Regions:
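Iron-associated oxidoreductase/ferritin-like identity signal
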Residues: 1-281
């Protein structure tokens, strides 16, 4: 099989992992705190690791990792229904990996897909167990229908965090600079924390987190990547600052200011890296 075809198959797998991450996080946040929600978040983190491995493999093949999200299964009126959807999503992934293992003849890539498939088979069993557990424990969707200025602010924050997670990961895959790569990955992890904090806060105040992203910068040059990342961090830090000043909820104000301070730090780190890059260039 030629390299371009392998890249296309791996990108299809990335899109499936991307869908699984967002579907599982949506379900976990909607259930609130609890053992099952924590276990589902842990599965989502394993899917993130799969996405990372696949993206790195694509770059090694001189390809570009896809930022598209595959099809999710988001219907269902109960937590047990959600878990059934998660079972089916894992079945979709397992079938895709098995097919690609047969098609791809590169030993290293085949071995990676077999490794990922092993995880998916385990996840499949976990979600089958969660169907029964959700029914037995009467697990509930604790999201509410609140829609006001506060939930709007929080959902805008989620949109930003999701966007920069994708952007920083993409830049980390595409830059040839190891220091920049490491910083991008570190800041992406921090942004993942922010997304979780914001989603949990919305659920706590009877709202509904909306996990969607805006346009992602896909610059090819490291300096351009850093300029785009500095720009978005400065813009969102200012937005969090305005929102914090507007809020009368002490806990929310503290959360927004904490995230603002992180975003300011990210912009400064990227600024240092840009200075180094421009001097070297």
């Amino acid at each position: 099989m030629d390299k371009d075809r392998i890249i296309a198959l791996l990108n299809r797998d990335i899109e499936g992992e991307h869908a699984a991450i967002i579907q599982y996080l949506t379900h976990a946040y909607a259930m609130g705190e609890g053992e099952m929600a924590c276990e589902i978040e842990a599965i989502a983190r394993e899917e993130m690791r799969h996405l990372d491995w696949l993206a790195e493999t694509i770059v090694e093949l001189s390809g570009v990792p896809s930022l598209e999200r595959g099809k999710m299964r988001m219907d269902g009126g109960s937590v047990a229904d959600w878990m059934r959807n998660d079972v089916m999503l894992e079945e979709d992934g397992m079938n895709s990996y098995r097919q690609h293992i047969k098609l791809i003849d590169a030993p290293k890539i085949k071995r990676l897909l077999e490794r990922i498939l092993s995880d998916e088979e385990s996840h499949h069993g976990d979600f089958e167990h969660f169907v029964e557990k959700a029914q037995k424990e009467g697990a509930k969707d604790i999201r509410g229908s609140r829609q006001d200025r506060i939930t709007q602010i929080l959902n805008r924050g989620i949109e930003h965090e999701y966007t920069v997670i994708l952007q920083y990961l993409f830049h980390s895959y595409m830059t040839p600079k190891e220091e920049v790569k490491q910083e991008m990955q570190d800041q992406a992890i921090n942004e993942m924390q922010h997304l979780g904090w914001l989603a949990e806060k919305i659920v706590d105040i009877s709202g509904n987190p909306r996990i969607e992203h805006a346009e992602v910068d896909q610059s090819a040059k490291t300096a351009d990547m850093l300029r785009a990342d500095i720009k978005i961090e400065q813009e969102v830090a200012a937005a969090y600052d305005r929102a914090a000043k507007e809020s009368t909820d002490t806990d929310l104000k503290q959360l927004l200011l904490r995230i603002r301070d992180h975003e300011v730090y990210h912009a400064e780190v990227f600024g240092d890296l840009l200075t180094e890059e421009e001097h070297q260039g």
